[in-house]
A protein has these predicted regions:
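Beta-strand-rich structural segments
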Residues: 80-90, 260-274, 327, 371-383
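Extended, hydrophilic extramembrane loops/domains of integral membrane proteins
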Residues: 124-151
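Alpha-helical transmembrane segments
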Residues: 171-184
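Membrane-proximal low-complexity regions enriched in glycine and acidic/polar residues
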Residues: 49-119, 375-377
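Internal/C-terminal transmembrane anchor helices
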Residues: 187-214
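Residue-level recognition of secondary-structure-to-loop junctions
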Residues: 115, 125-129, 305, 312-318, ...
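Membrane-interface segments at or immediately adjacent to transmembrane helices
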Residues: 210-282, 319
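Hydrophobic, ordered structural segments
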Residues: 305-352
Length: 482
């Protein structure tokens, strides 16, 4: 259709030009051929860009006594039902969770899931507009607030230029044909024909440049999302087109406290002291909190967001001594950060207890400090491990540690805290995306390559998942001088 419109317009324009100036047929043919070639070569398919989350949201939540994985299925730019999956793990209590999808000025939608045996439970809510939303997961005692985005259908400026250009060219084509047939003066027909070619040039140029134009900064990833900037992210580009924009943000400060079986974490902006409420989901969680007890037991928990900058998790500090911890977070504009803190045990009379038995076997080929070592963990004999937090395995490394009764106190000042991963291997023919915890086909061996920075004794823990149970295998590794 576009080629026909171009040919007709060119013939109309060229006929008028020939009548007025006496151009040769060869010149007319070359002129027509040039425009047809430009039209055929320079018109790729131009589609609208969807701004927002392009994938499902997977986030771990240590809610009450449960270790949950909440999956918010992608919705938008075409609005529809909001599908939510909740994975409960072995050891989690049965019960009912109330789910609420909320956004200021939007219709609130509610639902619930009834948890039973370990597995996946689903609910369907509704969202009625694009913008930033919160999914509230309430167990009756604590309400976890998970931020997510509903993307909008966004038309980029070059797509608008292309659409308007083609529309104007079509309208001017009709005017040009009518003027050619009815005008008594040849130059009058030349005006709409020339305008049509200009409009067509704008349209073809916009369509040609569309695949090569960079997307605008992403709301929710580069800067704080609002209803306005999700609907029109290009407005921010236009208003800041004079100079480059610095989206960086300062580090975060962490203050931790414990009491009444609850561990509280407050995050504040180091430049302003205000609550830091711009965390991104990083490796399947808003916060990865690693806690080492006085006896050397490691806990990997994911505090839930209860208010801006405030996070909580159920945690009993039953040992006397120091509970050392690090919080691994990713801040919008601030990158990945590792924050340290500690709390004291709440039972002065209680002494450190023995660590729980290992649920796997670890062997290591240890190289001198600074060189790559190989750590292998084996969990059972069957290849049925499940991905947890998007990974087959997690390895926590703390050290070097001196000898002493309070391991938590030594861990607090240890120079090395590391969190390594064993990635999910790509599946042949897979279309992409993160496999959920229903996929049980990995292992039983998990291998890590890690370089210990300093010589000394390290505590190492490897974690994975099988049959919806989180398994942990601890070991000590001695690293020699290079």
């Amino acid at each position: 259709m576009l080629v026909v419109m171009t040919l007709v317009g060119v013939v109309s324009c060229a006929t008028t030009v020939r009548r007025s100036r006496g151009l040769s047929p060869v010149t007319l043919m070359l002129f027509s051929g040039l425009l047809v070639v430009v039209t055929l070569v320079g018109v790729p398919a131009a589609g609208a860009d969807g701004i927002g989350s392009d994938a499902d949201v997977h986030v771990a939540q240590s809610l009450g006594g449960r270790e949950l994985t909440v999956t918010i299925r992608r919705v938008g730019p075409v609005l529809g039902p909001l599908h939510v999956d909740v994975v409960t793990h072995r050891g989690d209590a049965p019960g009912t969770l109330q789910l609420t999808a909320s956004s200021p000025g939007a219709t609130t939608s509610r639902g619930q899931v009834k948890l039973g045996t370990p597995g996946i439970y689903s609910a369907t809510l509704n969202v009625d507009r694009a913008g930033p939303w919160e999914l509230i997961v309430d167990d009756g005692h604590t309400a976890a607030r998970i931020p997510f985005l509903v993307s909008a259908q966004v038309v980029p400026p070059w797509k608008k230029a292309s659409d308007y250009g083609f529309f104007a060219a079509g309208a001017l084509l009709i005017v040009s044909l009518a003027a050619t047939l009815r005008a008594r003066r040849n130059w009058m027909a030349l005006v709409p024909a020339t305008a049509m070619i200009v409009a067509l040039t704008v349209a073809v140029t916009g369509a040609t440049l569309s695949p090569y134009s960079p997307p605008p900064p992403q709301p929710g990833r580069d800067y704080d999302p609002t209803l306005e900037n999700i609907r029109d992210p290009y407005a921010r580009v236009a208003s800041n087109s004079i100079g480059a924009i610095d989206y960086s943000r300062p580090p975060v400060n962490m203050a931790a406290s414990a009491g009444q079986s609850t561990l509280r974490v407050n995050l504040t902006d180091s430049a302003t002291g205000r609550p830091a409420d711009d965390l991104l989901i990083h490796h399947g969680a808003l916060i990865h909190l690693i806690v080492v007890s006085p006896a050397g037991t490691m806990s990997h928990v994911h505090p839930v967001r209860v208010a801006p900058g405030r996070y909580e998790a159920k945690f009993d500090t039953t040992e006397r001594g120091t509970y050392a911890m690090t919080a691994e977070i990713a801040r919008r504009g601030g990158g990945v950060q590792l924050l340290r803190g500690s709390v004291d045990g709440q039972s002065p009379a209680a002494r450190p207890t023995a660590a729980p038995p290992s649920q796997g076997d670890i062997t290591a080929t240890v190289a001198p400090a600074g060189s790559p070592s190989t750590i292998r963990a084996r969990f059972g004999d069957t290849p049925d491990l499940q991905p947890w937090l998007g990974m087959v395995g997690h390895m926590i490394v703390v050290g070097p540690l001196p000898d002493g009764p309070d391991i938590g106190e030594h861990a607090l000042t240890a120079p090395v805290w590391s969190h390594a991963h064993a990635m999910v291997p790509p599946a042949p023919g897979a279309a992409g995306g993160q496999p959920d915890e229903s996929v049980a086909r990995y292992g039983p061996d998990i291998e890590f390559t890690y370089s210990f920075a300093l010589a000394g004794r390290y505590k190492v823990w490897v974690q994975t998942e099988r049959d919806y149970a989180i398994l942990t295998a601890p070991t000590d590794i001695e690293v020699r001088e290079p």
